[in-house]
Amino acid sequence: GRSHGIHAEPMSFGLKIALWHEEIKRHIERVDQVINISSVGMISGPVGTHATVPIEIEETVCKELGLKPAPITNQIIQRDRHADVLQRLALIATSLEKFSIEIRSLQRTEINEIQEPFGKPGFVSTGSSSMPHKRNPELTERICGISRVIRSNSYAALENMPLWNERDISHSSAERIIIPDSFLAADYIINTFYKVISGMKVNEENMLKNLNLTGGLIFSEKIMLSLVEKGVQRKDAYEAIQSASIESMDKGIDFKDVIKNNDMIKKNLNDLEVELLFDTEYFLKYVDQIFKRLELS
């Protein structure tokens, strides 16, 4: 795992994907909600009084169309409903951008833990027009770019909510662009992301290799907490582990060796105890329970 772009503690790649899965489930729930909110119709006359159009006509027409009559309107259905729809699309697009940024980040040459599909039928087969060796994450970059457009459109939908009196048509010209464009763009990036995730290559060897890049520094918190359990003040334990970490990084010495030769740590942890602390499985002990809670196992 990484936080602030820096190695944090071990986790499984499956947990990362499960996090995305749960977020997508929330989007599906939101779509169901907004369908209910937005599936309304109205035929209520120039200012919403029904003076020239009886309510019964509105109810009959809406029923035929599978809509609910809006309880009250002026000349139009209020644009908070439209804005809500586009906000939900923007949320979906932004999640796909978030997932895509992660894929792009993990595809970088020096990380190379996953790769989006490349060279297969229906996928990109040219990374760079001038550098033949490149496999650029073009599909996920495209998702990120289009997501920005959908978010911008959702802001325009908010701008369409305040209108003069019982209606003006300043919203109309914008809606002719932002509503169809947002749905088309969302459909495109959803399908593109499905293609990416379905054909994505996972490089397990590089994941393990990168896990060991820091020479064991990823176990720092576990060692610190073990010292605290031995009665060392947390502040003192933190400073000792931080000092050992800096020495390991600056001198290129394996973190475990630095720990074993630190006087304060040696007083509290013997070599066998230190060895047992450098265990990646410790960090994964609740993974199965998390998946069960997500109903994925």
Where are these regions (language model features)?
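Internal glycine-rich alpha/beta core junctions
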Residues: 9-163
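Short, conserved phosphate-binding/catalytic loop or strand-edge motifs used
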Residues: 1-8
